[in-house]
Amino acid sequence: MPFVTTDDGVRLYYEEAGTGTPLIFVHEFAGDHRSWEPQIRFFARRYRCIAYSARGYTPSDVPPPGSDYSQERVWQDLRCLMDGLNIAQAHLVGLSMGGFACLHFGLHHGTQGTASRALSLTLAGCGTGSHPAVYEGFKAQSKVLADEIQTLGAQHLANTYGMGPSRLQFKAKDPRGYAEFNARLAEHSALGSALTSRGYQGERPSLYALTEQIAHINVPTLIMTGDEDEPCLEPSLLLKRTIHTAVLAMLPGSGHAINLEEPQWFNQFLAEFLAQVEQGHDFARPVATRPESIWGPSGDPR
């Protein structure tokens, strides 16, 4: 089995297919490297596609309590993966927790020029728990969930978190696909999921506190969200307004795991975006078209 070892000694399992420009997929809290199979099969025809399982997600290592499960560590793991595979630059695609990882990678390596290691960013379903009105509650809920997972196991996670409001659209449209997703969720390491929920989910900073840093990102950025993924709607608009090289795609009648729920739409939007990036399209919005405020008409909610 192929692994890359991070600079703090954690082995990350990865799979790859295809040749060409590297295209790296970063999974959500309820997923793992297998979550990207519909994308790997499609994009491996023209890209070097790589999907990996984050620390805490088998077959990657599950570091014990006291180890580093943090937002900072997660984007560093992505960098270690690239270093281990001798990848200087790549297109980065992340869903939810993976979207946060790609965004934070972009904060350090998302400025065009010789220092940029991100050719583009795709941030899908990114922003749950970020709005100031729900931020503290989300952090508290993440820690409660961590305790429940550690006590009751991953099957409990599948029976509760896997049945959340933004998952029901997937279940209704594609019962077989949803059943596969939920069965895989029940296979997760309870310890790894608990530590991720407590450390990464429960301690990550709000996007609303990072707008000045996010505004420095100037690589092409695709923001995607389902229009029924309520926790991600406002944060997606915030990202669109803040990153001046961003475009926004909203998938109708769709929930959170849009790459699995609507793989054809997801792949179509991503393929068109990547084609424009590789053709040298200028994604920078003219100053005259930019919003007066990144907060929208309701004003700063902080």
Model-derived segments and their meaning:
Residues 132-137, 151-213:
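Conserved alpha/beta-hydrolase catalytic His-Asp/Glu region
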Residues 6-67:
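Conserved HGGG/HGGXW glycine-rich cap/lid loop of the alpha/beta-hydrolase fold
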Residues 230-235:
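Conserved alpha/beta-hydrolase "acid-adjacent" motif
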